[in-house]
Amino acid sequence: MAYTPNRVGNCLALQSMGNPSWPSEDELNEIKTIVSEMSKRSKEDVRIVVSPYRICPLGAHIDHQGGNVSAMAINKGVLLGFVPSGDVQVILRSAQFKGDVNFRVDEKLYPNHCSNKKEGTNANGHAKLQEDNNWGRYARGAVYALQKKEHCLSQGIIGYIRGSDGLDSSGLSSSAAVGLAYLLALENANNLTISPTENIEYDRLIENGYLGLKNGILDQSAILLSSYGCLLHMNCKTKDFKLIRPLYMESSLKSETQKEYQILLAFSGLKQALTSNPGYNHRVAECQEAAKILLNASGNSHVEPHLCNVEQEAYEAHKSQLETNLAKRAEHYFSENTRVLQGLEAWASGRLEDFGKLIAASGRSSIVNYECGAEPLIQLYEILLRAPGVCGARFSGAGFRGCCLAFVDANYAAEAVEFVRKEYMKVQPELAAQMNPETAVLICEQGDCAHII
């Protein structure tokens, strides 16, 4: 994979001065204390995996079709404190879920697909983390992935995992952050040297192989490859990626009129997808069916049915053969892929307002063409577009639960937060009342990639 390791602060027009603000020393010390008590080891022996959540400004729903995507880590996520267990035992506790998880890394693990009644998926195609006191399956999935790649594990871990309060099931890829945290901890405990690109595939083994889901590699890539202050671009067909920063920062020049933007997250209060939605896997199947028809029509029936394998010219020539739903899915893919490429240019040149307009268009296409989004999320998206200082918004995830993201002028951030909070209360009073008003709308910063402290 192509990789440009630009790891510099404030490399874009977001407020990104200094180092990431998360995790704090207090958070780290608290987790070290808990793991020390669990393991009867010194706090100095405790290691902590920092695995951030992510946002994807452009590239909605096209990673599984091999499209281009963009992403960045944020300063919220999962912290996993651990020590090597000294034997093959894994002992885990969670701040969010009840009950200890205990198993052995030398157990032979087999796929735990969602046909199992204890499993379920959310609208993003990820497994639900909390059902039936089965929250430890991502840890088992990490062992499964390492076993499948023929790594011999002799060390388990004693660990304590905590996600940022209120952000699980929020459309920020908490499940991918959890899976990667376990992978990094187990690899560290067993002295395994695994590259980020390998771990992208390992985490996909957790979700695709162990849990039987059909999601792509966007979330894992964003968490593992992001760099503080930069925008990650990934081609999901070739797996090539690069980190992008505006040209004016390359030359250490900044226009006096250049606005600074922050990331705004607005939560819907929906923790579970509505039962009437068609589901992530169904949308993936529709995209593949559209690709199959277009490839057959263009004489390429032997090619794997993904929309990335359909040339733009072939799509334009044969799209009339697609029935209405499939035509909409294909239109979303090709228009979104174009928006990503245009967005990369806007970002690189520091045109954040143009970048924001493309994000808003992405959100609209997700609703109209990809036909995803529960009513509360659609309302939240529309409120954000009216909020002071917001230059672009869309769902963070599939739009059936969780939150919406937006880029907001830093000078208007506080005003935008208050506007969104009040307007959402008007249209969804019951959902709004269920949330803590202090965390229902958040201002975030960029974060760094997953790493171990």
Residue ranges and their predicted role:
Residues 119-125, 143-144, 148-167:
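Glycine- and acidic-rich phosphate- and metal-coordinating loops
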Residues 131, 164-177:
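Gly/Ser-rich catalytic serine loop of serine hydrolases
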Residues 193-244, 393-396, 443:
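Alpha/beta catalytic cores of group-transfer enzymes, especially the acyltransferase/condensing modules
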Residues 73-76, 172-192, 405-408:
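DPxDG-like acidic metal-binding loop motif
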Residues 1-58, 66, 79-137, 145-147, ...:
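C-terminal nucleotide
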Residues 93, 155-163, 194-205, 356-358, ...:
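Beta-strand segments within the central parallel beta-sheet cores of soluble alpha/beta enzyme folds
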Residues 149-158, 186-202, 409-423, 427-431:
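Phosphate-handling active-site elements
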